[in-house]
Amino acid sequence: MYQPDFPPVPFRSGLYPVVDSVQWIERLLDAGVRTLQLRIKDRRDEEVEADVVAAIALGRRYNARLFINDYWRLAIKHQAYGVHLGQEDLQATDLNAIRAAGLRLGVSTHDDMEIDVALAARPSYIALGHVFPTQTKQMPSAPQGLEQLARHVERLADYPTVAIGGISLARAPAVIATGVGSIAVVSAITQAADWRLATAQLLEIAGVGDE
């Protein structure tokens, strides 16, 4: 049963782009996306605070679900919709502070053991990856593939799930067909020849999510 320790998110969050700049956040919100993540890596809090503030303000303006990757203190300080954490960040994060601030929590997983760890934290949603080979970040694990993804989705049948990793426009329909609630994409949009067209096509496949 879906009883998170954090505020819930819709069972289906639809298309979920993960981007590294406020410019991309604004572009995608304007294009109709309603679930996004700002992921800026390896910078100090004070270096990214202005971007976090601007992204959160845009999310509010468009009534969107904007998650901040990693910078949970800034997300709390400026009242983001939610925080996304990698498995390696869970131990070093004050989950009680995130919960007390009323922020949603998403957690990355790569196998059954990490799903167990995520479930113990009772987050708002669980991300499952990486589904396909990806150039976006170095991954210590092998790609899961569609069969493994479908198995994880079945295991988490009543939990909001997000598939991530190497999901292209061509692969998106098969990923959605597993029953996963959301697809997170990076280069499928940011490296597309026509990002507006790619976004529109991905929205057609994955939707904007439930209200």
Swiss-Prot record:
Job description of the protein: Condenses 4-methyl-5-(beta-hydroxyethyl)thiazole monophosphate (THZ-P) and 2-methyl-4-amino-5-hydroxymethyl pyrimidine pyrophosphate (HMP-PP) to form thiamine monophosphate (TMP).
Regions annotated as coiled coil: none
Keywords of the record: Magnesium, Metal-binding, Thiamine biosynthesis, Transferase
Keyword Magnesium: yes
Pfam annotation, one family: TMP-TENI
A GO BP entry: thiamine biosynthetic process
Known EC number: 2.5.1.3
Molecular function GO labels: magnesium ion binding; metal ion binding; thiamine-phosphate diphosphorylase activity
Protein name: Thiamine-phosphate synthase
Pathway it works in: Cofactor biosynthesis; thiamine diphosphate biosynthesis; thiamine phosphate from 4-amino-2-methyl-5-diphosphomethylpyrimidine and 4-methyl-5-(2-phosphoethyl)-thiazole: step 1/1
NCBIfam families per record: PRK03512.1, thiE
Enzyme kind, highest EC tier: transferase
Family per record: Belongs to the thiamine-phosphate synthase family.
InterPro entries: Aldolase_TIM (IPR013785), ThiamineP_synth_sf (IPR036206), ThiamineP_synth_TenI (IPR022998), TMP_synthase (IPR034291)
Binding positions (Mg(2+)): 70, 89
Superkingdom assignment: Bacteria
Residues where 2-[(2R,5Z)-2-carboxy-4-methylthiazol-5(2H)-ylidene]ethyl phosphate binds: 134-136, 166, 186-187
Cofactor note: Binds 1 Mg(2+) ion per subunit.
Organism (species): Escherichia coli (strain K12)
Name of the gene this protein is made from: thiE
Needed cofactors: Mg(2+)
Binding site for 4-amino-2-methyl-5-(diphosphooxymethyl)pyrimidine: 37-41, 69, 108, 137
Reaction(s) the record says it catalyses: 2-[(2R,5Z)-2-carboxy-4-methylthiazol-5(2H)-ylidene]ethyl phosphate + 4-amino-2-methyl-5-(diphosphooxymethyl)pyrimidine + 2 H(+) = thiamine phosphate + CO2 + diphosphate; 2-(2-carboxy-4-methylthiazol-5-yl)ethyl phosphate + 4-amino-2-methyl-5-(diphosphooxymethyl)pyrimidine + 2 H(+) = thiamine phosphate + CO2 + diphosphate; 4-methyl-5-(2-phosphooxyethyl)-thiazole + 4-amino-2-methyl-5-(diphosphooxymethyl)pyrimidine + H(+) = thiamine phosphate + diphosphate
GO CC annotations, alphabetized: cytoplasm
